[in-house]
Amino acid sequence: METAQPPISYAPPKRGAVCAYVRTVVTTTTVSDSGGNNEDRLTQIVAQLQRTRLNFSKLSQLQRRRVRNMQKLIRKKNSVIANLAARLTTQKKTKHFAVTIRKNVIHTTSGSEQFVRQRVLELCANGGEQVFCARRADCARDRRRVAEALATALGAGVVASAANKRFEIEDEEKLVSAKLIVQQVLHDGDHSDTCAD
């Protein structure tokens, strides 16, 4: 800070005398302990960064947990989808298979559930009797097994027609035993052919 001071003497100046003013300059410097202050600020910054690092580590742990949970959920979902797809595939491969006896003819029907049930109802409405109806894996093999069992048990008294879709029993007295043979072949046969609904 600079200040100008008035002349020292108050006497009026004499003629010819040299008048001089003394100028005094005062500089004030405040010396602060900046070293300690900087250390405090640095410790605060370091502490804040450490807290931030801890927060980041907590967040990353939470994120890892969430990712693990999501992976578990995705695995479960994928296994459920795979199971449903496998079921759907087996259901598409399977067909309904029915055996009906009308008069002295054994009729076998295969196809969609609606078609088979409708055909069985038609035959039963005309005096037929339902012997078997279920979902099967291989209807052609079931027809072959029924044909073989009837041919073995009844011999020449059975006439197969339409690729083993119809079997005519010539002796009506053997119709009851033919019915039992069909039931035994289809119920007691290979259980892997039967598919649960």
From Swiss-Prot:
Keywords: Early protein. InterPro entries: Baculovirus_E26 (IPR021286). It comes from the Viruses. This protein is required for viral late gene expression. This is Putative early 21.8 kDa protein. It comes from Orgyia pseudotsugata multicapsid polyhedrosis virus (OpMNPV).
